[in-house]
Amino acid sequence: MICQIRKQSYTLMKENSLTVPVVELLNVHKGFDGKDIISHFNLTINNGEFLTILGPSGCGKTTVLRLIAGLETVDSGNIMLEKQDITHQPAEQRHVNTVFQSYALFPHLSVFENVAFGLRMQKTPAVEMTPRVIEALKMVQLDELAQRRPHQLSGGQQQRVAIARAVVNQPKVLLLDESLSALDYKLRKQMQNELKALQRKLGITFIFVTHDQEEALTMSDRIVVMRDGRIEQDGTPREIYEEPKNLFVASFIGEINIFDAIVLDLLDEQRVRALVEGHECVITVSFLVNIGQHLNVLLRPEDLRVEELGDGMQAEGMVGYVRERNYKGMTLESNIELENGKMVMVSEFFNEDDPDFDHSLDQKVDVTWVESWEVVLHDEDVA
């Protein structure tokens, strides 16, 4: 039964555009103890996508999840599920299921009974319930452990039970509240891949909440970055990482170097000559600038190039000195101090055939990058 539903929903997902809204939050406001948590909040989540809400602690991301689930009530605004207003609908009547960080498994029940619990509450006939539970357990590769109790399972297995218990109810949307954070690094990486594969297989919309940037980049079709109850940027993982809209998003997602720049000359509509940390070079801008304007130039550590400078050699870029380097297997990460005192992070893919690759401490180097690889933003303070 659930196998047929799964195939039908996956086919439906492929036939329909991912721009078909399944969840909409319209001008939603929620506060606690007189403090606004989210205000004038608008978000559309499309059918069949894996959306991650990412942000630091206290940004409001879990509140958004709980409002969708019906575990909190809105102060104002509307929540829609497939164009139906569910703003005041109780949680048990919404076709939405939640996997919590704690998994919330019943310790006295077997794996099978934990997964079957929701169906029993709905008074689902045994002839239908049993194959649905077995199929859900097969999807998370736990059908052979159906009679075990939660304490007999690993953390990853417990998480799979929680997911099976949620998907067996055939929800339109599955909500996951930091549900990988309790796992160790290796298991978390494994579960990231398994969750994404399961989401593709089911065709269900997943809404995942996390503060872990790597998780968000790895698993998501789309990422919503939040701060102080508002959306800072909404885009694909690549857009979020490579085209951050402001310094908060840039510095929250991965490591990044932020350079001060002053416009010296306008070359054309996109290219300007600028002084970047004392080095004159050409940078690409996506907005109108004026001569003398201060800008921020952003470059990821992996976008910078380093060449050692010997006596009498002329630098093409910014001159600096290697103050620290860390070998990390595939990469060599260096901390470089520029002549003006600014510290720069550089990540280079390890090349064992290059005798000059592993730089010595205090080695004088030339730091450059490929023109147009930089992201240029208006000057602002780092969040």
Swiss-Prot record:
Binding-site residues, ATP: G55, P56, S57, G58, C59, G60, K61, T62
EC number: 7.6.2.11
Name of the protein in question: Spermidine/putrescine import ATP-binding protein PotA
Superkingdom field: Bacteria
UniProt membrane topology term: Peripheral membrane protein
PANTHER family on file: SPERMIDINE/PUTRESCINE IMPORT ATP-BINDING PROTEIN POTA, SPERMIDINE_PUTRESCINE IMPORT ATP-BINDING PROTEIN POTA
Family as reported in the entry's similarity comment: Belongs to the ABC transporter superfamily. Spermidine/putrescine importer (TC 3.A.1.11.1) family.
